[in-house]
């Protein structure tokens, strides 16, 4: 018994600790990448494209990574939107909230393995993204610098 415990402690435990530490640290690293609102906006644009590609190619497993990468970028834009005019901040904040909610629905549909529900949820993501694009966050945040 002690020999098996020693084998577990020396062979498997360090690997489990490393996996656990990396799984905790990855979202923090993504969040640190997107402190700049213009970089966050670029991340949102790219991840929406990645989600569209994943759903259209019926690769629902491909939804997970972009849906995790987009969240810190959404939070960054929400945080920076308070520096915009009240009306602009409200419109961008509303669009970001809808985008976040739509991404959650898409992630859930993909986790369920439902192509039909994923396509429906993707339309919601695209609608929220179009609403955000209409507010031209690139120009709004560019003027802040």
Label each residue range with its predicted role.
Residues 1-3, 28, 144:
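N-terminal amphipathic/basic-hydrophobic helices that include classical n-h-c signal peptides
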Residues 2-17:
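Bacterial N-terminal signal peptides that target proteins for export
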Residues 21:
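P-loop/Walker A NTP-binding region and its immediately flanking N-terminal helices
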Residues 25-31:
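Sec/Tat signal peptide C-region and signal peptidase I cleavage site
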Residues 32-145:
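Mature extracytoplasmic or organellar-lumen-exposed domains after removal of signal/transit peptides
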């Amino acid at each position: 018994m002690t020999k098996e415990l020693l084998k577990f402690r020396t062979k498997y435990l360090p690997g489990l600790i490393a996996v656990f530490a990396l799984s905790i640290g990855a979202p923090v690293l993504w969040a640190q990448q997107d402190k700049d609102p213009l970089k966050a906006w670029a991340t949102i644009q790219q991840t929406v494209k990645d989600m569209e590609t994943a759903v259209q190619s019926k690769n629902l497993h491909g939804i997970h990574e972009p849906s995790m990468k987009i969240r810190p970028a959404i939070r960054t834009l929400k945080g920076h939107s308070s520096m915009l005019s009240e009306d602009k901040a409200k419109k961008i904040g509303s669009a970001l909230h809808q985008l976040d909610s739509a991404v959650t629905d898409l992630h859930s549909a993909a986790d369920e393995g439902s192509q039909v529900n994923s396509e429906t949820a993707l339309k919601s993501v695209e609608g929220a993204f179009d609403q955000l694009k209409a507010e031209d966050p690139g120009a709004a945040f560019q003027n802040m610098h």
